Amino acid sequence: MSSQLNDPTPIPAQSSLSFTQGFFLLGQLSVVLLIAAFIKFFIFGEAPPPPSRGLSHRSATHRRSNSIFSSAQHDGSTRTLREKPSNSNVLRPVPSSATNTRSILRKTYYTAIPTNPSSKHGRHRIHHSSHQPESLDWFNVLIAQTIAQYRQTAYLLKDSPTSSILNSLTAALNNPEKKPSFIDKITVTDISLGEEFPIFSNCRIIAVDDPNSDGGRLQALMDVDLSDDNLSIAVETQLLLNYPKPCSAILPVALSISVVRFSGTLCISLVPASTPPLDTPSHSPSPPTAQTTTAGRSKREDQTSGSHSHAGGSSKEPSGENPPKTSPKSNVAFSFLPDYRLDLSVRSLIGSRSRLQDVPKVAQLVEARVHAWFEERVVEPRVQVVGLPDLWPRMGRTGVRTGDDSETGSNVPRSSTAADASGSARHEDSSREPEVLRFGSLLGTRPPFDLASRTSSFNVETGDLRSRSMTREESNGNLSDQFHMPGSLPGSGVATT
């Protein structure tokens, strides 16, 4: 009994770590596991594929397919990171399958099926598209804004001695190399740039077989329609009879040409920089003139003197002899199909005392000449090639769009001269009403037409400025349309009857 009381009871062994210490260690272990998982799956893991830009229910035909050159490009990128590239191997070549017509149509989800494979009259075979024709309402708005800006700019520069459209047309019409000797100086008496805008519609993309490009080339066809009675030009000149002696007889002639309606199919295509230039057939080479002969003789003399000086050892390198070479640029070519429609209204007035009005034969000759001029320039197979501008962002062309409500810090440091100029120009624009660009030159008084027709007549009379806008007045019981141009010089006016 006593021995049992003397035996000590065994004490259970206590843990060396408390609950708090164990919880802290467990938290550290979990943080280490999270960091390891983050490093493994987020830093060293593969990049996820880029999200699709299209809708989730896009059909299988509109899904992008992996390029067959993806693996080759991936290997090339890995190799260029390890190896030092040479100067001639920096720019990677573009695969031909990525720039041909089929690849472009596939990547832009446009279907072009050859439904008309037969060729006609030796022309390129056209592959018509099964894609539905598209409307061009947005394009019409942009074109209308551009034309409106051109009209306003031409009106504001009407008094400029160098940039005026009147001076440009006068110089073009009086070109001595093209104007016959029996026609006196041609004077432009009236110009109207119109009020309406062309309407483009029914745009479609076709594939055309072209031997100069791999896989052919793409061409945009769109219908264009313009109906504007105010698109006109009026000129005056004199026919000279040089037999039996020069200027033995003079016959005054006045013409007014208006474009009533134009409709046709516009073709637009891109011409790459590597494509050889298009050859446009010309009728006959221009005969050598005195200026060209003198220029050729002086050039030969310069070459001869340069060779002698080079032989003597005292020659210098000519500066600026060769024109600077520019890099080839991509061009856009546009033309009209031969099935266009151009309706003109030609009015004529021939004679000084006993006048002949609206002679049908004169109208036919003028219309035939205008059609020939148009077909020689922009009707298939002739095209107009225009160089595309440089679209690379440059600081010299950087501007800031200013607003009326808020002023940004970048547009604050403007000169007071520019602000005053813009304010005065804005004040002039608000005080004017340039509905139609119509102005005349300062010439002598001509007897008016004995017709009460539309505003396309072109007689010029001297008078004072009576109103701020173009108005019509009736005086002396006769119907006389007196046009006054706001901002024109005193003593000028355009009168029509």
From Swiss-Prot:
This is Maintenance of mitochondrial morphology protein 1. Residues 51-97, 277-332, 397-435, 460-497 are annotated as: Disordered. Residues 1-22 are lumenal. The keyword Electron transport does not apply. Residues 76-85, 425-435, 463-475 have a biased composition (Basic and acidic residues). Residues 66-75, 86-97, 408-419 have a biased composition (Polar residues). Belongs to the MMM1 family. It comes from Aspergillus fumigatus (strain CBS 144.89 / FGSC A1163 / CEA10) (Neosartorya fumigata). Residues 55-65 have a biased composition (Basic residues). GO terms for molecular function: lipid binding. CDD domains: SMP_Mmm1.
